[in-house]
Amino acid sequence: MNYRWFMLSILLLLTTHVQCQMVMPQALKAGDTIAIISPSSSPDSMTVTKGCAALREWGYKPVVGPNALKDYHGFAGTADERAADLLWALRDSTIKAIMCSRGGDGGVQVLYRIPLEEFTRHPKWIIGFSDVTTLHSAEAVAGVMSIHGSMCDGIAAKGERDSVNAILQRLLRGRLPVYQVPRHSLNQLGEATGILLGGNLSVFSGLAGSDYDFLNRADEGLILFMEDTHESMSKVDRMLHQMEIRGVLSKLKGIIVGHFSKYKYPENGFADMYEMLHEYLQHYDIPVCYDFPSGHHSRYNFPLVIGGRVHLRVGQDSTRIEFIE
């Protein structure tokens, strides 16, 4: 046997094994620093100010990235400037977590400017949703967990969002969430345990075939979470077909469907997005939870650990989602 080829094969096996083991970033403590960056669209400065105030109330020290408030053709600076802020937040040892100011567009421009090894070397919670799915995907491929959750506007909100923010605060301190939500008439019953990956459907669909495509890990037994906004039923249908053609859907162990908002309905005879999704997903013998309160919603965006091991039980009366150490 060729010795060099043998050693290369062993190295590849070891690398694959390491990547399958998702790393949980360290829990935060009072006084820790959280960086606020803008990897996508330019944020409203007042929203960032309110987000900083909320983090201080939580007991943390917020620090805003050098380019986070810039506006360059709608983005928060050039792609290089946004990438520089992310690298700064990852590499600075005094920064313990990273919160994105907002989503929007443009996160994909940052991805190929950041070597995946940077996420592995500096495992930190990256918090956000929507277009921040790009960073969740990169961390997942690099073997690091992240948080699909509220950003500056969400954490600054009071009233109905208090319960959501309380869960995010506990999660940052190391307490994994357990959710029990009411049944939905379209739910598919069953139980499954696997690694939770996902986020904004249109964003992670746009990464298909790239080095940042977490669906390449479908063989590992994934539970997929998806949500979206401003996408028509026909476009979502096309994204599902794309996953089916790739052979991804048949490998999933379960699906959690979050909020789908701001789309035209009824369309093509379907009353709403969930009905269209059910028409498609009912042919797979896996548990499916509909209308989980996470994603683009004016009130509820409960945090999820992307890359975390989760037990999903979809029962007759309710759905239980428990993250496992």
Regions found by a protein language model. Give the residues of each.
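Bacterial Sec-dependent N-terminal signal peptides
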Residues: 1-22
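ATP/NTP phosphate-donor binding region
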Residues: 20-94
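Conserved beta-alpha junction segments in alpha/beta enzyme cores
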Residues: 33, 42-48, 54, 191-231
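Short Gly/Thr/Asp-enriched flexible loops that form oxyanion-binding sites at enzyme active sites
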Residues: 103-121
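Short, acidic/small-residue loops that bind anionic groups at enzyme active sites
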Residues: 116-139, 145-151, 287
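Conserved anion/nucleotide-ligand pocket segment
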Residues: 145-212
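Internal helical hairpin/lid segments
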Residues: 215-273
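ATP/nucleoside-binding phosphotransfer catalytic cores, i.e., glycine-rich phosphate-binding loops
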Residues: 262-325
